[in-house]
Amino acid sequence: MKKLHLLVGCIWVLAFACGPQQDADNELLSVSETIDRIVTRMYAEWDSETLDTLSHDFIEQSLRPLEKESLATQYWKFQVNVPVTVSLMRDKAQKKIPFWLESSGFRRTPMEVKNEIYTYEVWQKDFNSGEVQLGINGFGKHRPVYFLALAPQNPSDELTVSPVFPQEQHIEQFREGAFTYHDWDGLVLTEVPESLQGQQLLTTIRGRAREAHLVDAFRSTDFPSGDRPDQLLLTWSEDPVRSIDIQWRTSENIAKGMVHYWKKGSTDTMQLEVDPYVMEDRLLQNDRYMHRFTAKLRGLDPGSAYGYRVGSISGAWSEVQSFSTAASQAVPFSFIWFGDVHNSAVWGNLIQKSERQHPATEFYFIAGDLVDTGLYRDDWDKLFTYAGETISRKPLLAVPGNHDSQDGLGAWMYEKMLSLPADSPVGMEGRSYAFTYQNTLFLMMDVTLPLSEQTAWLEKKLSESEATWKIAVFHFPPYNGVEPYTDIQDLWGPIFDRYQVDLVLGGHFHYYMRSQPIRNGQVQADPKDGTIYWISIGTTGKNKDIEREPYAAVQFPAEHLYQSITIDGKELRAETINLDGEQVDHFVLTK
């Protein structure tokens, strides 16, 4: 059983942006500000070869006194009302002990804490009442970061911990069965020393390893931005009948963006000027900053073809591209979907082949894991570059996967890369959303966010829809042969049954499976009586030794597949195609 008790990443992103403010060189800064300054200085003073060979000791020796103090005190802070003993659990596999740990008075004890994978040393220090200040996990990206347990030195005292930085700190009882990482809450403690049990456990996320990541950290993109617009991408954030969103990027030299667009056959050219979003990836040494533009075209004519180009008054322009709006009247339409693609060059070949083989396709979507690492902009550069001009002619939509929403830090880069509908649960705009295309309702759900906070919205959209076909798309497949998501089955399965959702599309596991119709957890003979759960893979395959699933209609090891679906009134025709253009599965549904 897989739990999805994930903490919303934005409260942890605050750790990268908040804390002491930068007013003068002699003031303590936040960890984020401190690392920003260090990285900027590194770029100015050291070449790429040096950046690629940095060691923990070299970095520590290069720190200025206030930088070192900030990194030793501003990572985790809280107030305690009584004297406490702080226990710090550090993964034994971490090669380098945090530079500040021993010098600040922490001492290693003989105790150990364990979960199914990691064994942690227990370090302890006594603190008086007042503020407790702790330092970074280290300069490496060691993902099982340290976590804390607190106990009053006087057992009769009642301990209160407040306020805490980062904000929204979760505190629970330190015990066997407790989780420590919100982005992996299925990983629970298996051994806790008796003397520590019942203390206050301060949980964390593995993404905190990235806050001071400098060793083996610097990257280069194969496709840096330039003054000429590239990465042209079409999406929707409103009605597909009368709107389109055009996105592109340039270097930071281009201060304003502009799109020229025209209805084909017309001599009238319209234009829209847009401001950039400045996107930083501070460890991307050859393209730290770039500008990303989004032009939202509205008031377009239904079922019409348009030409467009993007650029700026003072800079270069793209080649002319084209798009079409959706028809306002009921007509047949086709779309293509992919499972995980992981910014694969082979997937780029696959989507371009799919366009040639299915030129009538009106849009594409990816069921999560668009990239390997959602916070690495060089991975996004690969994704868009490998897709080529395909996504500048037909819209690309998506839902986030666990790789797009990295280590509990949220999917902010995904959100900035893709302009998506805001018809969403509160606070989940662009992550979970719905849109209707012709006679089909698409429910695009982000299951890396809490399910319970989306359930009422999901049911409301289904209850209000008069669409003939209903298709749900999300990354984690409820039915699979590796690790079934019983929480999705239990919470959303009855809703899919109640409103007769036709297809649930997903990925995550790298093989192919199309279920028989399922209702109330049981296989049904007639597709009209159940939902088909469908897993596919758009990149390299894995999971080759999965036993045959009892509910599977079709199942096989696979890689580099796409699915083309055509909806014509009350008929849905689907086929799965491999990289060689061969059909490997097909079926037809009718209403």
State where each predicted segment sits:
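Noncatalytic modules at the cell exterior or secretory-pathway interfaces
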Residues: 124-138
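Conserved, compact domain cores that house catalytic/ligand-binding motifs in diverse enzymes
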Residues: 331-408
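Active-site-proximal segments of metal-dependent phosphoesterases and phosphodiesterases across multiple
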Residues: 465-509, 523-527
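Bacterial Sec-dependent N-terminal signal peptides
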Residues: 1-24
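Active-site neighborhood of phospho(di)ester-bond hydrolases with catalytic His/Asp-centered motifs
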Residues: 337-339, 363-369, 395-402, 445-446, ...
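Acidic, histidine-bearing metal-coordination/catalytic regions of metal-dependent phosphoesterases
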Residues: 158-337, 558, 567-591
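Extended active-site neighborhood of metal-dependent phosphoesterases/phosphodiesterases
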Residues: 294, 305-322, 379-466, 491, ...
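Structural beta-strand segments of beta-rich domains
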Residues: 74-76, 84-86, 242-246
